Amino acid sequence: MDKAKAQQEIGKLRAEIERHNRLYYLEAKPEISDFEFDKLLKRLIMLEKEFPELVTPDSPSQRVGGGITKEFPTVVHRDPMLSLSNTYSIAEVADFCNRVEKLVAAEGGGTPEYVAELKYDGVAISLLYRDGLLVCGSTRGDGRQGDEITANLRTIPSIPLRLEMPDLPLFGTALSGEIEVRGEVYMRKDDFERLNEERPEEERFANPRNATAGTLKLQDSAEVARRRMSFVAYYLKGYDGEAPTHLKRLEQLKSMGFMTGAAAKLCKGMDEIADFIAEWSEKRWTLPYETDGVVLKLNEVSLWERLGATAKSPRWAIAYKYPAQQAKTVLQGVVFQVGRLGTITPVAELKPTRLAGSIVSRSTLHNFDEIKRLGVRIGDHVMIEKSGEVIPKVVSVVLDERPAETAEIEVPSECPVCGTRLERPEGEVNWYCPNEEGCPAQKRGRILHFASRNALDIQNLGESLVTQLVDRGLVSDAGDLYSLTQEQLAGLDRMAAKSAQNVLDALEKSKKQSYARLLFALGIRHVGAATARELAHACPSIDRLREMDEEALAAVPDIGPVIAASIRDFFAKPWVQAMLQKLAEAGLPMQAGEEKALVNNNFEGQSVIFTGALERHVRQEAEEMVRERGGRIVSSVSKKTTLVVAGKEAGSKLEKAIKLGVKVIDEDEFERML
């Protein structure tokens, strides 16, 4: 094919792909299957590889990702991205309306109108378009500046790479100059569930918002694309023909190719606002995405500037947040799950009950001390709560409704999977199955941990496949994974030659992971990712680590006598030694390589601990940012700790830091230090 014909076909393919993108993401009226869409995209990518000079920044092929971003540069926002003041009280919403009406009256205005919109539970971002082309995308950050994550945002199909302008009467002027669009990146419920199913149980995200925040900060844009996120726009500024009202600007955004909140409604007073909040209190659970409240804004945009803002939030808007959802049900029984370390976790079996838009039949009871604290018995009426978490929890017993016949929840004497007698080490809350080598549940858990994202990140090795491998005797530990053949894998349920080869390719790729990741992947009790990094730095080979005594190990930063004893105990086990031999023969990294260059030295000499819930970062990734800037992460507060980063609902660690006089900062200050 010559260049002219390729250019013609590329143009047709781009137009067709963007048309189907719009039908799928904006209008929910798909005309072709995912398979047919992928064929169009693959054809475009093939032609652009053959004629790279024809690639443009707004081509649909640029959504696929593939680049690695070593660090995210800082972008200063043109206007501050303020957070909204929020409330859980309808009365406080009414107070807000009264204040606004008084301020508007003082400005000589009439009765104001409001726009009520659903509050998407996602991550706020800013998009900058120059002459209609996306040139920059950034996070909210501290409100004044954020991280530039354009490469990751390009992978989101509902973010236009080039703005459309089909409705000239609505706009009245060309899309020239710089236009800023703000909105929320979020993850649909089905995409979130699919992502969590791929991860081991202990590494699953608590909710779609956490998954979104973590995904946006990934350095691999191809992985961002694979996770499937969405975007809803709610702010437009910089366009010469922008409408005078917020509702009309939402229409303009839709005409430009953005998805906007479908439920946005003009409200003329508090009665209509209260009706909207009440209506969506239940209806929101039927939506394919998470919403956690209602945003209320003045419709007349000219009033926004006149009313202004406080240091933290605008005076012309407020967010009403729905309270945590609770429901009453009956605890019908308890089952016991076995974790990778043999931990026995009680799980409540409930009378199926609707909660937060879904039918709940199970909830966690955490451990036997929690059962004792609650005083819960089988047959009790209990209150369950879901507040952002995927798994609901039992929060109380309705003692007034306790039936005459209830049964105590007894600690099992044997492992529910392998039948081994359970043990409870002195000073421990949990009971354990001591059959490490033989218990199928522990084998499955260890292998899933080994393959998890923060360990060796072995794609395509999910729970269903690992269960088959263990149950059929093909794999007993992580070392056996590297002896698997395509024939063995292809013979398993829901596997074929292609999917089997994908697993083998992922296993081969895992051999290139770091020595520190391997130490974490081994699943040594008390050794998390941070401790594994300290070990890798202090003991640069597995052989040297195995030879160290407890005293030498305890001298390693962040280790101490308990972890040191756990490490020695782990390496003394014959099955562990056999597994390490298999891993070494397979070519896994048994010693440290060259250390990665630091981003900067902003945290050099700092011993840092995070406590409480961060709003804009996933804990593990925030910790990695500290390490990349020369700092150390510690697991507990002591006199040696130099910095505590406190998020929402920070608890005992914050209290201890204050008592010891350790410096405490919030998330905004942390971001400024980066």
Swiss-Prot record:
It comes from Chlorobaculum tepidum (strain ATCC 49652 / DSM 12025 / NBRC 103806 / TLS) (Chlorobium tepidum). The active site is at K119. This is DNA ligase. One of its GO terms (biological process) is DNA repair. Zn(2+) binds at C415, C418, C433, C439. One of its GO terms (cellular component) is cytosol. Pfam families: BRCT, DNA_ligase_aden, DNA_ligase_OB, DNA_ligase_ZBD, HHH_2. Keywords: DNA damage, DNA repair, DNA replication, Ligase, Magnesium, Manganese, Metal-binding, NAD, Zinc. Its EC number is 6.5.1.2. Coiled coil: none annotated. Disulfide bonds: none annotated. NAD(+) binds at D34, F35, E36, F37, D38, S83, L84, E117, R140, E184, K297, K321. DNA ligase that catalyzes the formation of phosphodiester linkages between 5'-phosphoryl and 3'-hydroxyl groups in double-stranded DNA using NAD as a coenzyme and as the energy source for the reaction. It is essential for DNA replication and repair of damaged DNA. Residues 598-674 form the BRCT domain. Belongs to the NAD-dependent DNA ligase family. LigA subfamily. InterPro entries: BRCT_dom, BRCT_dom_sf, DisA/LigA_HHH, DNA_ligase, DNAligase_adenylation, DNAligase_N, Hlx-hairpin-Hlx_DNA-bd_motif, NA-bd_OB-fold. GO terms for molecular function: DNA binding; DNA ligase (NAD+) activity; metal ion binding. HAMAP family: DNA_ligase_A (MF_01588). It catalyses: NAD(+) + (deoxyribonucleotide)n-3'-hydroxyl + 5'-phospho-(deoxyribonucleotide)m = (deoxyribonucleotide)n+m + AMP + beta-nicotinamide D-nucleotide. It is an enzyme of class 6 (ligase). Its cofactor is Mg(2+); Mn(2+). The keyword Iron-sulfur does not apply. It comes from the Bacteria.
